[in-house]
């Protein structure tokens, strides 16, 4: 996929990664980390709505959520739409990502960082989760992909059994953890591998998918829990005040249907 660039808004390096923001003709503003697409303002809402609302609407009386990564603020924007949440913790290792996104992509967070329920911690999420004393009803893992041909990647240890075991320890009995699982067409193994890893730490595992054109079309998501499940019906009454742009009864039913371009059971 190629796009025309109107302006290169940001090119800077943090201690952790290269950060670039482009204004493009076809996909609006786009965020790249270490040269990899993270989002475009043309379709980011599809990704963020799926990652937040599909699991959160499945939970009974959720009160506390944790966001791992998500420095662009899109996950926070969707979480703060839920008045039933009393607290939203966020741990992000790279504060420069947050700063550049708040400056050049303010529509992503839409003021969510200033919500009084949000507590932001700048720290390595691996250590944060291992030492956490809180119990969370929802844990959203919005971390960068791991690429086989790149060594020492920032988020690599956030895809390990040790990390998932630690997440299980801070998850409420009726809670859920959810993560992005890459592109179903070009990286179908990613969803399969994450679900297999989840299954070593959680008794219940599943997946759903959404259409995100800037990610190559079909994006996978994996979830795990100690008992909670994703309902087969659209929770319309709970969703009616969430100002959703992508999710509705039709796209929800598609999301929870068998994922395309993957083997049966994925």
Where are these regions (language model features)?
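N-terminal accessory segments
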Residues: 1-56, 60
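SAM/dcSAM-binding transferase cores
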Residues: 1-20, 217-266
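Short, well-ordered coil/turn elements that cap or connect secondary structure elements
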Residues: 113-115, 172, 199-202, 239-241
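Flexible loop/turn segments at secondary-structure boundaries
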Residues: 148, 185-186, 214-216, 231
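Conserved S-adenosyl-L-methionine
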Residues: 180, 202-213
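The AdoMet/dcAdoMet-binding core of the Class I SAM-like
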Residues: 14, 39-179, 186-195
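A SAM-dependent methyltransferase catalytic signature shared across enzymes that methylate proteins
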Residues: 194-207, 226-230
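Glycine-rich, charged/polar anion/phosphate-binding loops
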Residues: 4-7, 17, 125-127, 206-210
């Amino acid at each position: 996929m190629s796009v025309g660039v109107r302006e290169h808004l940001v090119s800077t390096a943090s201690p952790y990664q290269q950060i670039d923001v482009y204004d493009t003709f076809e996909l609006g503003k786009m965020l790249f980390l270490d040269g990899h697409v993270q989002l475009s303002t043309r379709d980011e809402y599809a990704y963020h709505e799926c990652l937040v609302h599909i699991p959160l609407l499945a939970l009974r009386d959720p009160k506390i959520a944790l966001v791992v990564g998500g420095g662009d603020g899109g996950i926070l924007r969707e979480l703060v739409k839920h008045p039933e949440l009393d607290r939203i913790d966020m741990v992000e290792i790279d504060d420069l990502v947050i700063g550049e996104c708040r400056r050049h992509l303010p529509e992503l967070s839409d003021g969510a960082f200033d919500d009084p329920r949000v507590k932001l911690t700048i720290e390595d999420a691996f250590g944060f989760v291992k030492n956490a004393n809180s119990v969370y009803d929802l844990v959203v893992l919005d971390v960068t992909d791991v690429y086989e041909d790149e060594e020492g990647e920032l988020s690599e240890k956030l895809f390990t059994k040790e990390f998932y075991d630690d997440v299980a320890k801070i998850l409420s009995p009726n809670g859920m953890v959810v993560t992005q699982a890459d592109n179903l067409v070009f990286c179908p193994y990613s969803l399969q591998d994450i679900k297999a890893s989840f299954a070593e730490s959680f008794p219940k595992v599943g997946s759903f998918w959404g259409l995100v054109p800037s990610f190559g079309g079909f994006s996978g998501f994996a979830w795990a829990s100690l008992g909670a499940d994703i309902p087969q019906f659209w929770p319309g009454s709970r969703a009616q005040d969430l100002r959703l742009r992508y999710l509705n009864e039709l796209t929800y039913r598609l999301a929870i249907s068998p994922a395309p371009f993957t083997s049966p059971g994925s």
